A protein has these predicted regions:
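Structural alpha/beta core scaffold segments of enzyme domains
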Residues: 1-270
Length: 270
């Protein structure tokens, strides 16, 4: 699910045949063929070491990432680059060092999809935090709470460079409050009781904790032009096309707020 950014032969052959035959052409790919020929993304090997002080505060993080690039690399090393600049997550990590190897193998090629390296990095970091909690005898939520970047430290510079060449800077956020709210809504403190009750009924349930920060807003960037038509209606022109995420509604609301006019008098053209 989710491969993108690639052109496959069938995407060219099917419409070409349809035009040549002047009739609909349908191509059906079975699951085995899909697994053998479609790009994938997740295959990485992580070796992570972490240093902490006596209070459970992170002192440093280091390790090695081996990224399976597949038989060839149509998208460069974007995915492992994102992975290594994501693994620190929302935590204060004073010292950081990772070596990354992108290896050619005999597997299908790797391209960015559905997280583009972030899920692997987050999994590696959060499993590390769980192991640390068990080793030190500290609650899993507490060890994370002690290391989350506080809101007063925002904007927070991670000291890393993202794949687009820009520094990794967390512009805002209240990570401690976010985790506290999640734990409260998930009734985390009451979970041992619920787990014991479920076990008595022959059911096995567990609970996990994970924090993540995702880099977004990559360039190039889009602007907007606002014009007032002779009819008095406002026309906002932008290259930000609607994708099912209410872009047009959001733009109309922002425009209406700034111009102090109802959004039904605003036309969005993209």
């Amino acid at each position: 699910f989710g491969p993108k950014g690639m052109s496959y032969p069938e995407e060219i052959v099917v419409p070409a045949l349809a035009r040549a035959l002047a009739r609909p052409v349908k191509w059906i790919e079975d699951r085995r063929e899909h697994f053998l020929t479609t790009t994938q993304e997740r295959d990485q090997i992580w070796d992570v070491s972490i240093a902490l002080d006596v209070d459970g505060k992170i002192l440093g993080l280091k390790g090695r990432l081996i990224h399976d690039a597949g038989a060839y690399v149509p998208w460069g090393i974007i995915t492992p680059y994102i992975s290594t600049t994501t693994i620190a997550g929302p935590y204060i990590v004073p010292a950081f060092k990772f070596d990354t190897t992108a290896a050619f193998t005999n597997k299908p090629p790797t391209t960015p999809l559905r997280g583009a390296g972030r899920p692997q990095a987050i999994f590696a970091m959060e499993r590390t935090m769980d192991l640390v909690a068990d080793k030190l005898g500290i609650d899993r939520a507490e060890i994370r709470q002690r290391n989350l970047i506080p809101t007063e430290a925002m904007p927070y510079e991670m000291g890393l460079i993202f794949r687009d060449g820009a520094p990794v800077i967390y512009d805002s956020g209240d990570y401690p409050k976010c985790q506290s709210m999640a734990l409260e809504r998930g009734e985390y403190r009451d979970f041992p009781r619920r787990q014991a009750a479920a076990r008595a009924e022959g059911r096995y349930i567990g609970i996990g904790i994970a924090n993540a920060v995702e880099g977004t807003g990559l360039g190039p960037f889009e602007g907007a032009t606002i014009k007032v038509a002779p009819s008095g209606r406002v026309v906002l022109q932008t290259g930000a096309a609607a994708q099912g995420q209410a872009h047009h509604t959001t733009l109309a609301q922002l425009c209406g707020q700034e111009l102090n006019i109802p959004i039904d008098r605003i036309d969005i053209v993209s």
